[in-house]
Amino acid sequence: MKYPKSGNYRSAIVMKDLDFDGTDEAIAFYRTASENKAEVHMLVMYCANGGWKLSENCTIDATDVDCVDFADVTGNGTLEILSGYTTYNSSVNNLACHSYSGGKTTGLTVESSYSSFYCADFDGNGINEVMLLSLYNTENDATANMLVYSEERNCLYSKSTVKMDPNITRFKNLSVTATENSQNALIVDGCFANDDTVTQIIYFNNELSVLRNPLFKEKDKNITQRSADVLCADINNDSVIEIPVVNQLPSASDEDKSNVAYKTSWNTFYQQSEILNHISDQIIDYDNGYSFTVPEGWIDGTYTVRFDKEKQAMCFFEWYDGTLGEKLFEIRAFKLEQWDIGEDSDAYTLIYKSDSTAYAFADVNEDNNLSVSEDDIKTAFSLLTVNNI
């Protein structure tokens, strides 16, 4: 049996109702030990008269299965099987597409390789397209390539291609979000060889009938490039993906920068003008699993934050005329047993207590232009979850 190496379906046998008749079909991948050449078999099976029937045994020239996904790319109301297969080049895979209906499986012609792919309705016509993403190598440029279905030719062909950052060495996360006109855009988090993360946004411009990648400029640094390992996410549960822009807060030139916190500015993508629209700012403590949302009244350059790693604390300060000003407050993470016995915690007010950690604040400065109330501190505190980091 062969197990897909990536994607949402990792089983060698995948169950999926391809024709929406209420009964799952089965898709199985295998390679026999006796085969001398590199071939992977994909079996498509359906249930009839109380037993399983073979619809098709598809043979693909490959050694392994990269991934499998399902989408209605033909617009006929059934799900096509999109399966990817590895090649001798670890960053290049080959795509195959098969359509199932009434017990019969037929192949669609696809002549495109990829590094990662994603299926969604990118042009708003109600039918899924296939977005192929390719990393740069000696054989291919770094591109995004949108495939659409041609009924006349029974194939998936390239409708539009756009350049991507050739310095990306791998893709970390792909997600789709709706823009202000409800059209889907593909959010692509990738990383460089030095492990910096960068975001690119791929969308189809219906007026020009072209793919666009507005955050990538060949001669300019992408504003989303960041050393912090933070990915695009829906931070406020509004079903829209936010894009982070990360910058270190102010510090003195001779200061230890490892203790200086970063500000993460969260933005949505505004398609009409191809800009990032600012939503909110956060200071994130990854080690202790929480974030603090910066008050709207705080202006950039007037505040800064330091990590006290010995105390497991995040300390907020005024930043005035290039120097560290008054302390505003601090948030500290206590081990639960430490908090429960009152060890070094008398001056602290509890924000939240989990199974292992108590989060609390202290040293609230009430006489500063940047002062915030205790209730505001509690409201701005948030635990990190899968959806909001």
Q: Which role does the model predict for each range below?
A:
Residues D355-S371:
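Domain-scale activation on soluble regions of proteins
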Residues E318-Q338:
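A short acidic-to-branched-hydrophobic micro-motif
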Residues C191, F317-T323, D363-N368:
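Secondary-structure transition/turn motif
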Residues M1-F307, A313-C315, W339-A360, T379-I389:
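Beta-propeller-forming repeat regions
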